[in-house]
């Protein structure tokens, strides 16, 4: 409860407001945080802000990152279910008005073979600002319930990334992904895009991501595997070493400069949660260009503040 609200309404009202906040989150929890439209948030709390991506002239924070988070959820679902659903559209999402927030995303996906479409719900939690460090807690068709608790504390985390190996010659430890396999395993490209956009969510656009080219991708697991070891492509716990070029939003070098990133993924068999952590190797954090004044005074953020405060929207 916000202390300014207690000061405004007095101690007599504080207990009542606390009960209203508890009731609000109980109602939010009924849909696991995905369907909060029409749930009135009491003053003094930190409610989920709802964004309808289908509204005319819809503005919302981090549109590129939200789409990547939606794809990360589908990646987790496909990995576990042996499917190949692709993102068609982000329909809506909810998040907190905080630097780091869980994202509750409702999306439309399509099976590229049958062409059938299905609505999914995805929850992605962020753990670090300006670095790719996330956990996919929920990834399911909309009609399926997983009994997750909204905003429950999560203890599962990914270990620190390893050093870049001196070579990848150990065939029992490493697997070099073939170019044809890159096309059929677009999650590798997804990981690369997530690393870059997580570092600089304000500047990188879909157009920037379309120019990226993976020069080499190598996969490693902790278990030695006799070559040929294509099975590493489907390992639930793995380290991915990616060399790429085509990145134009950089201070050092240009789009022809080859760069490196390491991504570690760990799947928790007990909870079903997928955690992914990645970083650029030998480069500054792109978040150094993060301008809080620009970000928190952007039209999308100002609109979110008005929603949070219960004020009517105003034209920009």
Swiss-Prot record:
Pfam families, alphabetized: protein_MS5 (PF04776)
Matching InterPro entries: MS5 (IPR006462)
Protein family per UniProt: Belongs to the UPF0725 (EMB2204) family.
Protein name (record): UPF0725 protein At1g02770
